[in-house]
Amino acid sequence: MDTIYALASARGKAGVAVLRLSGPRSHEAVQAFGVPLPSLRHAALRRLTWNGEVLDEALVLLFGAGASFTGETSAELHLHGSPAAVSSVLRVLSGLPGLRAAEAGEFTRRALENGRLDLAQVEGLADLIDAETEAQRRQAMRVFSGAIGERAERWRADLIRAAALLEATIDFADEDVPVDVTPEVLTLIDGLLADLRREVDGSRIAERIRDGFEVAIVGAPNAGKSTLLNALARREAAITSEIAGTTRDVIEVRMDLDGLPVTFLDTAGLRDTSDLVESLGIERAVTRAKAADLRVFLLDDSGPLSGITVQADDLVVQGKADLRPGQGLRLSGRTGEGVPELVAAIGERLLGRTAGAGSLTRERHRLAIERAIGAMESVRAELLRGQQHTELAADDLRRAIRSLDSLVGRVDVESLLGEIFASFCIGK
């Protein structure tokens, strides 16, 4: 097996740069710089030299096989964050026999192949690297720490127990077996179905935390939607004008709202129009607004809006409060009046939804669980039809186990790895 190396920290000037090596020759490669090797898992300051020239001073860390991120013999060099110093060390490593530069995500791939991580943990690590908000960080850390794998192992153990009971019934079908295992198997299946359905119910919110919530600003033309978006973004994200119908496409602004990733959508003003381009913009606005997690209806004096109705959690506010006195939730994007209250109300509604978030953060996770649920529902139906259907029930149990195995990467993993590791940096 090749020994791989890569810069694990960001490129460019920095206080420290971290080079990572993994593979059978990683310790030998460090020794090539003319330094005595420190004890495993103990940092030591060493002067790296090559052909009699000092390249840099570095903290050197060595890890043994089975006790590193990848599960292989590994090493880290903590250099000064000088691009020139980093390049000089990389140049030496590139010329050593048995070493090559790592591909994107290759360190993590080796951790997966060596059983240090399961597939769900790999996805959690990718989400942790991409996390922009506190809620995303917490959720990704939970998955990376093995929350999905731990649950999958418990579910799998119960399924294997149920399968063993059924297989015993099949094996001794021609003998006088006094015990009917159907009640025990049904108890196991019913408990599992309840757990898995709860996970699926919470997966939609978990996926929204990962991908971000969408909040659509809806109203008539010239109601102040773009001005409100600019006030929320604290910059000129959208063009504002006294001319009605200025916004014709959906403008998106992503924000961190109380630790949640939220994309605000400034949509075209809703009205009847003969302008083809504007009508297309209105059609798109209605589609995006209906699909959004929450809508803010910005009212003016133009009357009710057509094409979309207010849902239970939506916010209805009176716009242009600086020009129109009134009661209730009122705001002005121009002066900022009411904007903090609106942000607080949006945050309260979205945070309330996250309380039910589960551990399944990706569509792949949810689909695997839904397949397992479908298989277990078939098991239940077959058992209730009588013991003559035990073999069919056993086949469905095996199908449920395979679905859970795909969740953590025991089966059907290779086709997913390219997509997952494409988002990783070289040093990860």
Swiss-Prot record:
Superkingdom assignment: Bacteria
A Gene Ontology cellular-component term: cytoplasm
SUPFAM superfamilies: P-loop containing nucleoside triphosphate hydrolases (SSF52540), TrmE connector domain (SSF116878)
Entry keyword Lipoprotein: no
Molecular function terms from GO: GTP binding; GTPase activity; metal ion binding
EC number: 3.6.-.-
Keywords carried by this UniProt record: Cytoplasm, GTP-binding, Hydrolase, Magnesium, Metal-binding, Nucleotide-binding, Potassium, tRNA processing
Binding positions for GTP per the UniProt entry: 222-227, 241-247, 266-269
Cofactor(s) annotated in UniProt: K(+)
Residue positions binding Mg(2+): S226, T247
Biological processes per GO annotation: tRNA methylation; tRNA wobble uridine modification
Binding site for K(+): N222, S241, I243, T246
Enzyme class: hydrolase
Ranges for domain TrmE-type G: 212-351
Subunit structure: Homodimer. Heterotetramer of two MnmE and two MnmG subunits.
Protein name: tRNA modification GTPase MnmE
Species of provenance: Cereibacter sphaeroides (strain ATCC 17023 / DSM 158 / JCM 6121 / CCUG 31486 / LMG 2827 / NBRC 12203 / NCIMB 8253 / ATH 2.4.1.) (Rhodobacter sphaeroides)
Gene: mnmE
